[in-house]
Amino acid sequence: MADWNPSLYLQYGAERTRPAAELLARIALDDVSDLLDLGCGPGNSTALLLKRWPLARITGVDNSPAMLEQARVAVPECRFIEADVRQFKPEHAVDLIYANASLQWVPDHYALLPHLISLLKLNGVLAVQMPDNVDEPSHVLMREVAYEQGYPNRAREPLPGIHAYYDILTETGCDVDIWRTTYYHKMSSHQAIIDWVSATGLRPWMQELSEHEQLKFLERYHELLVQQYPIQENGQILLAFPRLFFVARREP
């Protein structure tokens, strides 16, 4: 798959950073010496962590060279490593593992989450936020267009769900705070919705298509978006975007 586009991702930087800040606000840790930012992207979440814990040793981990290049410029005080989050292991146990809008791309959370918990110190915290929007029209319509035009399903798997996450985490010996929030982002047009998802959810669908095929796909996708997302009285469009959060503390 082609590398991520940091500029496109940060086109809606404020909207993407807000859930990161709200996840951070629910972490009840004062003294943090070592922490990981898994799937750190262009460093927007890493900057929040540095502001909260300026004396901590912060390591950002991502598998995108382009994102890491941007992150090193944005937050030069922190260390960044190119690695697969499933295989990366810190040199020693850490106080906090923070993963904002990244783990939804990683398969098999039933194995992944116990592994991540094992990397924490006792009383350490795993804090996670993930888009939970595969059943929203924005993503359902991608699958519909692919089916219409004869392309394979390249959608990511749905998240296991709140009850499954609660069981996975409590069975690994964690105290768990879990919640789900739906944001309503103001979009200026239906094309703006396409611009938003082009940086993330639409990427797998576009990767294997020719330029002509991409244009045909996006033209039909735009037609269906117009049918599903009404224009408000002031000309704006509200894009519903559910996100799932949890903060899990490893109990002694």
Curated annotation (Swiss-Prot):
Transmembrane segments: none annotated. CDD domains: AdoMet_MTases (cd02440). Gene3D superfamilies: S-adenosyl-L-methionine-dependent methyltransferases (1.10.150.290), Vaccinia Virus protein VP39 (3.40.50.150). GO terms for biological process: methylation. InterPro entries: Methyltransf_25, SAM-dependent_MTases_sf, Trans-aconitate_MeTrfase, Trans_acon_MeTrfase_C. Belongs to the methyltransferase superfamily. Tam family. Catalyzes the S-adenosylmethionine monomethyl esterification of trans-aconitate. This is Trans-aconitate 2-methyltransferase. The gene is tam.
